[in-house]
From Swiss-Prot:
<comment type="function">
    <text>Fluoride-specific ion channel. Important for reducing fluoride concentration in the cell, thus reducing its toxicity.</text>
</comment>
<dbReference type="GO" id="GO:0046872">
    <property type="term" value="F:metal ion binding"/>
</dbReference>
<dbReference type="GO" id="GO:0005886">
    <property type="term" value="C:plasma membrane"/>
</dbReference>
<comment type="similarity">
    <text>Belongs to the fluoride channel Fluc/FEX (TC 1.A.43) family.</text>
</comment>
<feature type="transmembrane region" description="Helical">
    <location>
        <begin position="35"/>
        <end position="55"/>
    </location>
</feature>
<keyword id="KW-0813">Transport</keyword>
<keyword id="KW-0406">Ion transport</keyword>
<keyword id="KW-1003">Cell membrane</keyword>
<keyword id="KW-1133">Transmembrane helix</keyword>
<feature type="transmembrane region" description="Helical">
    <location>
        <begin position="4"/>
        <end position="24"/>
    </location>
</feature>
<feature type="binding site">
    <location>
        <position position="78"/>
    </location>
    <ligand>
        <name>Na(+)</name>
    </ligand>
</feature>
<dbReference type="InterPro" id="IPR003691">
    <property type="entry name" value="FluC"/>
</dbReference>
<keyword id="KW-0479">Metal-binding</keyword>
<keyword id="KW-0472">Membrane</keyword>
<keyword id="KW-0407">Ion channel</keyword>
<dbReference type="GO" id="GO:0062054">
    <property type="term" value="F:fluoride channel activity"/>
</dbReference>
<feature type="binding site">
    <location>
        <position position="75"/>
    </location>
    <ligand>
        <name>Na(+)</name>
    </ligand>
</feature>
Amino acid sequence: MLKIMLAVFLGGGTGSVLRWWLGLRLNPVHHAIPVGTLTANLAGAFIIGAGLAWFNRMTHLDPMWKLLVTTGLCGGLTTFSTFSAEVVFLLQEGRIGWAGLNVALNLFGSFMMTALAFWLFSSLSVR
C-alpha cells in the first residue's frame, strides 16, 4: 500500500508543479483565455487517454505505474477547480462570450484529446 501511495504522491506532485509552471508561463499569453490552464487540461486529457490505452495492452506492468500516470500525474496536472474559477471570473467581468469559449475549449477539447490519444495508442502494435 505504501508503494502505491508513493506512486500517486510522486505523480501528483510532478503534475501539480507542471500545471503551476504552465499557468505561470502561458496564462499571460491571452487576455481572456487562460492558456496555461487550457494547456494543462488538454495535455492531461491526452496523457490519460494514451495511458489508459497503453496500460490496457500492457497487462504485465505493475498497476502502480497506471496509478502514477493516471491518478497521480494527470490528477495533479489537470484542474477542474481552477478552470471553474477562471470561468466565474470571466462571467463576473461580463465576458460571457469568452467564458463560453473557455468552457467549450476545456470540455470539448479534453474529450477530443482523450479520445484521440486512446484511439492512437490503441492502434499501436505491441512488440
